[in-house]
Amino acid sequence: MDNPMLNSILRWSISQTDTGSERDPNAPPVVMDPEKREFLERVMNQMVEDEGKSMKDLVEAIKGPEQSLEQASVKVDALEQAIDRCDKIDYAVGFHSFANGLFPTIELLETSEHGNVRATAAELIALVVKDNPPCQAWAFEGQALPRLLALHRGEVRDGGPVGETEKIRAVAALSALIQHTPEAQLAFLQAGGLDDLQRDLALDAPRRLRARTLFVTRSLVAESPEARRACLERAGLLTLLATNSVADDAECAEHATASLCALCEVPAGPKAGIAPLIAALPPDYLKLLRARMAKLEADPDAAESLSAASSLVDALIAA
């Protein structure tokens, strides 16, 4: 987020800098005029106060009532403004450490009766916790995992339907919550998260939701040995991954193929290895996969997908 006040300070600082001639690098630093220093400190303090007050005001709006559609609209607007402010990691940390905004946002997943509020809250959570270990930890403390899983399952307070956008944003937030964190990934698995993902992988599932779920599955099995082992214990999930890997949808096929490649890397043992995967493959799977490879060969932009499909064929034949 570009801060107008910060940009003004930068322009003012440049205007106060003597750039007309070269300075001796060994010369002592130029001492800022006391009046200029006082001005700069005053503006910087004002900037911090203004940003902090704005963040706290947004959190108060997020915590406000939503008995009417108008109140719900005000809350969505506050959540969207927080999203605009939290697009940088320092602001994301400050959203909770300074304004204590993460907990009430997480609570909306459970308490709100408006789908647009829940969806926007999930979007904000995903942004705040992504690549942000302190916020990931705070989100776990605020029970983000069970509440996001419940939203993804369609378990909401008003008992009404949960739309595709809500589910997509819940899955995206779950992905951000557990990424790069083995303990979080294990908690996700223990909470039944893999079974929840499997429900969205059928070919008749909404396309955007299926693609997002396959992306999350791909990331999870690439990072987590426990997730790879858990996948190999679920024949239904393996069959769905294989079916998606030869589907017409290029994005879904790419993510599913990458997931299967990761599963093929599980170390083999007396009764381990990828035997469960082989058993779960649809009839004529290798033939279908090779047919997809033939299509990829004609696409100059599909080199990565072609390489993954080729690696999968080699791994299955070697097994």
Protein language model annotation of sequence segments:
Residues 39-137:
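Alpha-solenoid helical-repeat scaffolds
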Residues 83, 93, 106-107, 123-126, ...:
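Register-specific detector for alpha-helical tandem repeat solenoids, activating on a conserved position
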Residues 2-39, 66-83, 113-129, 141, ...:
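Alpha-helical solenoid repeats of the armadillo/HEAT superfamily
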Residues 46-50, 92-98, 135-142, 184-191, ...:
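Short, hydrophobic/charged alpha-helical patches characteristic of ARM/HEAT alpha-solenoid repeats
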Residues 57-61, 102-107, 144-152, 196-200, ...:
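Buried hydrophobic core positions in alpha-solenoid tandem helical repeats
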